[in-house]
Every structure is written in structure tokens, then in C-alpha cells.
Curated annotation (Swiss-Prot):
One of its GO terms (biological process) is tyrosine biosynthetic process. Pfam families: PDH_C, PDH_N. It comes from the Archaea. Residues 6-288 form the Prephenate/arogenate dehydrogenase domain. It comes from Methanocaldococcus jannaschii (strain ATCC 43067 / DSM 2661 / JAL-1 / JCM 10045 / NBRC 100440) (Methanococcus jannaschii). Its EC number is 1.3.1.-. Gene3D superfamilies: 6-phosphogluconate dehydrogenase C-terminal like domain (1.10.3660.10), Ferrodoxin-fold anticodon-binding domain (3.30.70.380), NAD(P)-binding Rossmann-like Domain (3.40.50.720). This is Probable arogenate/prephenate dehydrogenase. InterPro entries: 6-PGluconate_DH-like_C_sf, Fdx_antiC-bd, Fdx_antiC-bd_sf, NAD(P)-bd_dom_sf, PDH_C, PDH_N, Prep_DH/arog_DH, Preph/Arog_dehydrog. The lineage of its organism: Archaea, Methanobacteriati, Methanobacteriota, Methanomada group, Methanococci. The keyword Ribonucleoprotein does not apply. One of its GO terms (molecular function) is prephenate dehydrogenase (NADP+) activity. Keywords: NADP, Oxidoreductase.
Amino acid sequence: MKNTNLTISIIGGTDGLGKWFARYLKNKGFNVIVTGRDIEKGKNVEKELGVEFTNNNIEAAKKGDIVIVAVPINVTERVIKEVAPHVREGCLLMDITSIKEIPSKAMEEHVKEGVTVIPTHPMFGPSTPSLLRQVVILTPSEKHKNTEWFNKVYNFLKKEGAKVIVIPPEKHDRIMGIVQGLTHFAFISLGATLKELNVDIKESRKFASPIYELMISIIGRIIGQNPYLYADIQMFNPRIKEIHETFINQCKEISEIVKNKDREGFVKIMKEAAKHFGSEAKRGAYYSDKAVFALTSEIEKLNKLIGKDVAVKNINSNVVHFGVLKDIEDDYLILNKNGKEQKFNILRVEVFAGDELSKLKKKHLEKKYIDVSVLFKKDVDEEVILNLLKKMFDIEIIDVYEGEKIEEGYKSITFRIYGYNKDELKNIEKEFLKIIKNIGGKERFK
């Protein structure tokens, strides 16, 4: 696709995943139009992303070579019926909702002859940095699979590093009924159960096994999302009803077995489930072990950094903070920044030390320096000394002097030592002079 020649209209592109695609595609050189009901928000997005905004869906559909419907699931069918008839012949209509049978049927029924339809489900959220290694599901009919537009979209996604899966919309909704529907239903039910039992989540974590920690984290992640989106996933997938009934029946059966103290019955169900999983049971154990290890090793790593210089990077905003890691309290780390304490949620930051810290300092901070003059005997090769010190400091020689006021048989070497703040330079100077003394030098003056 020649990006600069194509206009992509994103219906609902002022928020969520629609806005994500607006930014991503604009950065790839496409002309992008976004629509939304909130004019003030739309104008802000227009300015922020450098795209065109209109609150007229039909106008945007008429202009787009590619039209992407990116509205909430509960209004997707209505919006498709509104815009599909206005997509020009020879152009492409897509949607990016997480159900596929309803939008696929609506698009097929309401487009003109000669318009290609590619229902699409990106399996990621708007916090994802790029398409690299992300799953994107395409559900075109056979008619639209054998088109130039399909090849262009497929090849673009592959070129961007996405994992592209092509399946019929019916199969998609059956699979998503499990992958999203059952998963969300189970974890939201768990969260609601903990609420009904009035469980103090923070208190319970003090007694938690690693698996409980993982479960609580997953529940928290899911129930902290947009509840309307999750409601629509449950209510608009035609396959969900059967899945719910099966899940609830299994819960009732296991509950009855426990109530009757039927130990063998319980063992039978668990063994049969494990047999059904086959090798995936061991794979699940392996991945959960890795997740547990990651949780514990992260805390161990942070404990070893207490009292040391670190960089703390917010994984959402990418803002970087520098300071000394003072302590870890529950889910928070405490950073001493120039004498002031600041708390950061461990789950929302990355912590850097060593070489990674040095790279971040070079990128984000302005260098400062001190000059320190030391005396060495005349026959000492200052380049050898410098090469040794470079392994420990950001340092250079700015002067070598053997004239007046220099002790006989000695020469003065002035080093310029770099750092990023007064406290750091003070510590560096102390360490520097200690090393100088141990290799036969002595301080002259600063």
C-alpha cells in the first residue's frame, strides 16, 4: 500500500483502540480521518495526532479508501448500517470489535457491490506500543478473501510484525466465547464472590501463595477495565449462553460433590480435566512457574538495589525518575529524590541500575563535572592511569603539568570527572581519591 495516497476513515477514532489505530496509521504515512460524538474531544485528537476530525460519520465514510468501524460493540451494528452504504465502490470496509458474526453479517448486507469487507479483531489494547508480535484475527468471507484489498491488509500486518490468523466469523465467536467470554465471566465471578464474602484483599495478600497472588492480579486487571466493553463481550456474542450454562453446571456439580464429601468423585473430575488438557497441563505448570518466579525474582532484585542509585520508569507514561532506592513497602518502592521521598507502585514501573541506568542518565540528564588535580611521579604514564580509571568513571584528562609549585620528581595530572548531580559527584570524588591513593598518587587540589 502506498500510504500517502490512501485515506483511512476511523469511525469512533477519538478514543480507545480507534484512537490507537489513528495514531499508528498516521505515523505510517496514511491520511487519517477520525469521527466522534464529542466535538471538543475530536478537535483535541485532531491537534494531538495531526489527523482530520469530523463528527459526521457518513462524510468520513464517503472520503475513506479504507473505512474502519471502531465503536463500542453495543452500537456497532447500528453504525455499520449507517456508514456501509456510503463506502465507495472499490474501497474497503473493516471493523475492529471483539465479536465477528454480527458485524460481518451487517457489513456484507449493507455495502455496495464492489466494496471489500474484512471483519477484524485486534487481540490487544490501546496500551500496546506497536503491532509487533500482536495477534490480529481476520474473518472475511470466501468472496472477500480472494481480493486485492485482503492481500494488502494481510501483507501490511505481516510486515508490521503481527501474527495474523484468518478464520470464519462463526469459528471466531466460538473461540472468543471461551478465550474472552469464559475467562472474563470466571474472573469477574471470582471478584464478585470476594466482594460478597467481604474479603479484605490487601489483608489476604499477607497470607497469599504465589498462585493466589497471580489470581488476584488477574482479577484486578479484568475488573479494572471498561465494564461496558466487558458487558458487551458477554451479551453480544451469540455463543456465550451455552458456555455460561456449561460453566455453571460444572460449578454446581463440583459443589455437590464437595458437599457430599465424595472424594473419589472430586478426584475423577480433576483427573479427567487434566487428561483433556494433555501436554498443556505441563505447559501450564511451566508458564505459571515462570510467572511466579518473575514475581519473586523482581522483589529480590529490588531488595538488592536498596541504598543504590536507580532509575524508575513509568511503563504507561515512559516518564523516568532518578534517585536512591530507599525501601520497599508492600507494592510500593520508595525513591529518595534529592532529599524528597516519592512512592511508586511496583507493578507500574520498571527499575534500572548499572549500565542501563547510565544509558538513561545520558539520555535524560544534563552532565555536571568536577576537576581534581593529583600528583604522580614523573615516570608514570598518564594514559595507562586514564585507561584504568575509565573502567570505573566517566573521566578525561584536561591537563598535565610539571612546572613551578610541583614537588620535585612529580607531575600534576588534572582529571575532569562527570556525573549528574552534586551528591553523585561527591561520592564519585571520594571513590576516585581512594583509588588514586592506592595506585601511588596523591591529591593536589580541586
